[in-house]
Regions:
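Glycan-association/targeting regions that enable binding to alpha-glucans and other polysaccharides
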Residues: 1-80, 85-97, 162-163, 167-178, ...
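C-terminal ends of transmembrane alpha-helices
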Residues: 46-65, 112-127, 182-199
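Conserved, compact domain cores that house catalytic/ligand-binding motifs in diverse enzymes
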Residues: 64-136, 142
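Generic detector of multi-pass transmembrane helix bundles and their immediately adjacent loops
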Residues: 128-131, 135, 140-216
Length: 216
C-alpha cells in the first residue's frame, strides 16, 4: 500500500477492424502489486467519470505468468470438484446409494487440483508455495485448507467399503462438507490474498521479499 498521488495517463485513440477505441497503458507492477485507477472522459460534451462515485476506483492486482500446463488442470479440477461436491451433498440428502464414490472423487479432485496444483500456481504467480495457515493469513489458501479437511473428515467417516451401509452420521458428514465447500466458494477468490508492501520496495528491498500474506 502507498500514499502516492494519482498519476495522470493520457489515453490514445486506436482504430482497428473492430472499430475505434481509447487505450491507456498502466505501469507494470511486481507480483502481488496493486494499482487503483479511474477514467475521466468527455462524452457528448459532458465530463464523465468511471466509476461514477468520486471515492470509488478500479483495483487490479499483478502476478507473474503461470504456465497453462499448471493453470488449466488446476482450474478444471477445482470446477469438477465443486460439481462433484454439490452432487455428493444432494446424494447425502436424497439418494445415498453412490454417496461414498462421489465423496471420494471430490476429495481426489480437491487433493490434486487444490493441494498439489494450487501451491504450484501460487509459486509461479507470487513466489511462494503456501501462504495460508500456519505460514501466513492468505484467505485463498485457508479456504482450500478448510475445504480439504472437511472432505478428509467426511471420507474418513463414510469409509472406503462401497458395500458398507450408509449411516446417518456419514450422510451428515458429507452434507456438512458440501456446506463448508459452498461457503468457501462464495468468498471472493482473491480476498485477503498476497499483497505487495510498497514501503519496503521504496526502501530498495527486493519486491519478491516484500509480499504480505493476508495477515494485515
Amino acid at each position: 500500500r502507498t500514499d502516492d498521488d494519482f498519476t495522470p495517463v493520457t489515453m490514445e485513440t486506436v482504430t482497428s477492424e473492430s472499430g475505434t477505441q481509447f487505450e491507456g497503458a498502466l505501469p507494470k507492477q511486481p507480483a502481488a502489486g496493486k494499482l487503483q485507477y479511474y477514467i475521466e472522459a468527455e462524452i457528448a460534451g459532458q465530463a464523465r467519470r468511471f466509476p461514477e462515485q468520486a471515492d470509488q476506483f478500479v483495483l487490479i492486482r499483478f502476478k507473474d505468468p503461470v504456465p497453462d500446463g499448471v493453470l488449466i488442470p488446476h482450474v478444471t479440477l477445482m470446477i469438477i470438484s465443486i460439481l462433484l461436491g454439490m452432487r455428493s451433498g444432494l446424494s447425502a440428502l436424497f439418494a445415498p446409494y453412490n454417496m461414498k464414490q462421489l465423496a471420494w472423487a471430490t476429495l481426489c479432485g480437491m487433493t490434486v487440483g487444490g493441494m498439489i496444483l494450487g501451491p504450484m500456481v501460487q509459486k509461479y504467480a507470487f513466489g511462494e508455495y503456501w501462504t495460508g495457515f500456519p505460514l501466513g493469513g492468505d484467505w485463498t489458501d485457508n479456504k482450500m485448507l478448510f475445504m480439504f479437511l472437511a472432505w478428509v473428515f467426511a471420507c474418513s467417516v463414510v469409509g472406503l467399503n462401497p458395500r458398507k451401509k450408509n449411516t446417518t452420521t456419514g450422510r451428515i458428514a458429507v452434507f456438512t462438507a458440501t456446506i463448508v465447500m459452498t461457503v468457501c466458494y462464495l468468498i471472493p477468490h482473491s480476498m485477503g490474498g498476497s499483497d505487495l508492501d510498497y514501503s519496503q520496495v521504496d526502501k530498495g528491498g527486493d519486491p519478491s521479499k516484500a509480499i504480505e500474506t493476508g495477515r494485515k
